[in-house]
């Protein structure tokens, strides 16, 4: 396990680089036979790792020494030298390169902000994958707020400091990063370029945008969730007031110019009685909207997944996932929760009587199976990542896989479960501080643990969609706007 702490690091290494084509065996690749950096860089230097971070002080230079191998020239911050003392401010980076002939290997050390969350890393993640995370949520503890993109070594290669708690950060074309704020005070998703500048906002025509989900369709529209208050509802059968406001769950699709093209609401489709298990929470803890209206959150929509003409919707407080025919609005099937005529029969699931408990992050895979993060909330069991095969002809949901982590005992909220291209899983364990990757059989492969914080989701992104060069350039641009350090 590795923890980022200021200290002295002295590492003896041998770095090899290769160019295109084949080279004669007698030609030695550029190498560094020794490196020292003060304060400590994370992770330890390795020729295969090109991005590092350091906790630095602008008044105290980062001191670097690099010893080249035979026939190689070291370059520190672009200058041919073996030692340097470089002053860095937050977000700034220094490069260390080694050159032999036309072959160069470059490495990048970037200064973390002093308030960037602490984290530890175990193992190595799936190659070719980034992880977008928002490690800022905590239970009663004030913290700085960041959207961050980590590489397979658990190194934050890009980050953006936000004014409020970011939630549901996701990659959009550009590349850009979109996120909402928690609680949903902004009533919009902000879209930021990698240099931090605001590229736009996604808003709901109704104003009460939810902060749980944003999807982009193939034609460029945006699909998201909306808080939909329904007033003057008699809630006395459920232990509530005779004249209450129910917070219905609503899905909206808008164009990039915010024109509404489709919507669907739980109102008229999902009965309040489907939330019976959650009544103590619903009635005991009303939700106050940004305009001050007190409401009762019977449904708590938290995830949407698009599957051609079908939309999957997760409602936390019915313990159910609903398949909605986009053309008719009809519920085609339901997985979990209070039985209804649309309910699927669950097959092969040891928790089949209650397959879902406050679940999050339903996703449809290319093969038609679905994955979901089952929080197991208030069911006396640990959370899990689950995959089901849905058969509409037999009206069944057959469990194919489940992933658990013995280090994670409970989950009260949040979480995500994504299958990677190689069949591994990446899981954010809800209200727990762990983001992990697991083999298909559940074997732990990689883990990031945030110090007392958790990320609403962990979103894997293929490197084919986002390059390290783009992330570094974005960070360099943000650093230049703040306070360039004297070199």
Predicted regions and their residues:
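Secretory targeting and sorting signals
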Residues: 2-25
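Intrinsically disordered/low-complexity terminal segments and short unstructured peptides
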Residues: 19, 35-39, 81-82, 327, ...
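Intrinsically disordered, low-complexity, compositionally biased regions/tails
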Residues: 20-25, 38, 43, 47-50, ...
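Histidine-/acidic-rich catalytic cores in large beta-rich domains
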Residues: 110-487
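Beta-rich interaction/scaffold domains
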Residues: 24-119
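Compositionally biased, intrinsically disordered low-complexity segments
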Residues: 14-16, 38-40, 485
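Acidic/proline-rich low-complexity IDRs
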Residues: 3, 7-8, 31, 87, ...
């Amino acid at each position: 396990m590795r923890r980022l702490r200021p200290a002295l690091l002295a590492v003896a290494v041998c770095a090899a680089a290769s160019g295109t084509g084949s080279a004669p065996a007698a030609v030695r690749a550029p190498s560094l036979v020794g490196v020292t950096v003060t304060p400590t860089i994370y992770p330890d230097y390795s020729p295969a790792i090109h991005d590092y971070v350091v906790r630095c002080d602008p008044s105290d230079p980062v001191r670097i020494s690099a010893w080249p191998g035979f026939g190689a020239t070291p370059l520190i911050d672009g200058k041919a030298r073996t030692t340097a003392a470089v002053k860095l401010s937050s977000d700034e980076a220094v490069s260390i390169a080694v050159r032999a002939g036309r072959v160069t290997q470059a490495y990048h050390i970037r200064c973390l902000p002093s308030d960037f969350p602490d984290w530890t890393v175990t193992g190595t993640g799936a190659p070719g994958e980034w992880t977008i995370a928002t490690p800022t949520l905590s239970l009663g503890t004030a913290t700085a707020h960041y959207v961050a993109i980590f590489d397979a070594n658990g190194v934050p290669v890009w980050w953006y400091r936000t004014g409020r708690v970011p939630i549901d950060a996701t990659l959009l074309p550009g590349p850009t990063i979109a996120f909402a704020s928690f609680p949903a005070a902004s009533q919009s998703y902000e879209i930021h370029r990698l240099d931090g500048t605001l590229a736009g906002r996604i808003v709901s025509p109704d104003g009460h945008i939810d902060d749980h989900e944003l999807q982009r369709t193939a034609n460029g529209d945006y699909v998201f969730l909306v808080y939909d208050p329904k007033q003057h509802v008699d809630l006395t059968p459920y232990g509530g007031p005779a004249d209450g406001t129910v917070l219905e769950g609503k899905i909206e699709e808008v164009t990039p110019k915010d024109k509404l093209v489709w919507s669907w609401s739980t109102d008229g489709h999902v009965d309040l009685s489907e939330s019976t298990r959650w009544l103590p929470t619903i009635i005991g803890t009303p939700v106050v909207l940004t305009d001050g209206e007190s409401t009762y959150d019977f449904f708590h929509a938290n995830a949407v997944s698009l599957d051609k003409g079908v939309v999957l919707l997760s409602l936390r407080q019915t313990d159910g996932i609903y398949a909605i025919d986009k053309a008719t609005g009809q519920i085609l099937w339901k997985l979990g929760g209070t039985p209804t005529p649309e309910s699927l029969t669950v097959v092969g699931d040891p928790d089949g009587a209650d397959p879902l408990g406050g679940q999050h992050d339903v996703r449809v895979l290319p093969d038609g199976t679905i994955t979901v993060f089952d929080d197991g909330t208030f069911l006396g069991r640990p959370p899990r990542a689950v995959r089901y095969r849905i058969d509409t002809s037999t009206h069944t949901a057959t469990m194919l896989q489940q992933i658990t982590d013995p280090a994670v005992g409970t989950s009260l909220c949040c979480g995500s479960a994504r299958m990677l291209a190689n069949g591994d899983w990446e899981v954010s364990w809800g209200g727990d501080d762990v983001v992990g990757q697991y083999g298909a059989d559940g074997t732990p492969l990689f883990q990031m643990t945030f110090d007392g914080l958790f990320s609403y989701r962990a979103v894997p992104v293929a490197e084919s969609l986002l390059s390290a060069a783009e992330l570094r350039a974005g960070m360099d641009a943000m650093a230049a706007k703040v306070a360039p350090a004297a070199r």
